Structures are given as C-alpha cells and as structure tokens.
C-alpha cells in the first residue's frame, strides 16, 4: 500500500502577511498576491466579433524572489452565463534588483512567452522579449500587458496582441476584484 503524501513542507503564500515571508524583491508586486476574479471584454480582427469573458488570476510565492502566476478565462453569453473555457496560462514572474520584471508565461495552445517590464507604483507593464511557438500553434509575434491596482481590492488588466498577420492592437481588458 502506498502511504498518503505528506503535507507539502513549503506552502505558497497568497498574502503578504502569511508565511512564508515574501522575499524583499517582491515588494513592488506584493499587492498582486492572492486570487482575483472579474469580467472583461475582448476582440480581434481575426475573430467573428467582440466577446465578454470572465477571468480568474492567482499570484503566490514560496519565499523566493518570484511569483507563481496562473490565469483562467471562459467566454460568457449575452446573459453572462458561462459558454466554454477560452484561455489558460501559467508561469513565473521574476523580480530583479533594479525593479525589472521578467515573466515566463506558457499557454496550452503551444505559445510560450518571455516578457520583460517594470513594476512602477501600482502598475506593472510587460512586453514581449521572445515568443516560442509549438509547430501547430497560431502565429503570435508580440504582446503587451498592463496590470494596474486601482485600489487594494481592484485590479485592471489590458492586453494588446500582434498575431496572425495583424499589427499590435487591443485584444483584452478586464476589471477584477480580490477574492477572500
């Protein structure tokens, strides 16, 4: 018989005031820790029209100088009822001593991005440094993302996209509220 797995000895922290203590380099992004949920709107010239979606973001840490990041989204119908999953991604945000943020983000659709940017005040701006594509992934050239804490419990998200022959332009935006 297999013994049950022991409790993980190094749980992630989801709030600045819970163990493990956040690494000092995380100071500029501590406000992101936790889970966020909200709704947004999106569109792109290669899609059949604009759409509404719901989104959940989670940021946590294990005491080292990076954040674990996960995002899930699903499309909503005209009555705000869930239609189907639409996007999912996960990765790591690495904070540097000079204030830079390096984000490694992967999607199950075969897209992996390395993004670089800065955390300035309540805003984190990230832009593509490199994109790696699986052989069957859609062509993505670059993205830009902005995360802004408008208050302790509200996070806005904006995402621009250059893909499938289209120039860089608005793709997604959402307003999220802190959960719990």
From Swiss-Prot:
SUPFAM superfamilies: Lipocalins. Its EC number is 5.99.-.-. Keywords: Heme, Iron, Isomerase, Metal-binding. Coiled coil: none annotated. It catalyses: peroxynitrite = nitrate. CDD domains: lipocalin_heme-bd-THAP4-like (cd07828). Its cofactor is heme b. It comes from the Bacteria. Residues 1-20 have a biased composition (Basic and acidic residues). Heme b binds at residue 171. Disulfide bonds: none annotated. A motif (GXWXGXG) lies at residues 34-40. InterPro entries: Calycin, Nb(III)_bact/plant, Nitrobindin, THAP4-like_heme-bd. GO terms for molecular function: heme binding; metal ion binding; peroxynitrite isomerase activity. Binds 1 heme b group per subunit, that coordinates a highly solvent-exposed Fe(III) atom. Belongs to the nitrobindin family. Homodimer. Heme-binding protein able to scavenge peroxynitrite and to protect free L-tyrosine against peroxynitrite-mediated nitration, by acting as a peroxynitrite isomerase that converts peroxynitrite to nitrate. Therefore, this protein likely plays a role in peroxynitrite sensing and in the detoxification of reactive nitrogen and oxygen species (RNS and ROS, respectively). Is able to bind nitric oxide (NO) in vitro, but may act as a sensor of peroxynitrite levels in vivo. This is Peroxynitrite isomerase. It comes from Streptomyces avermitilis (strain ATCC 31267 / DSM 46492 / JCM 5070 / NBRC 14893 / NCIMB 12804 / NRRL 8165 / MA-4680).
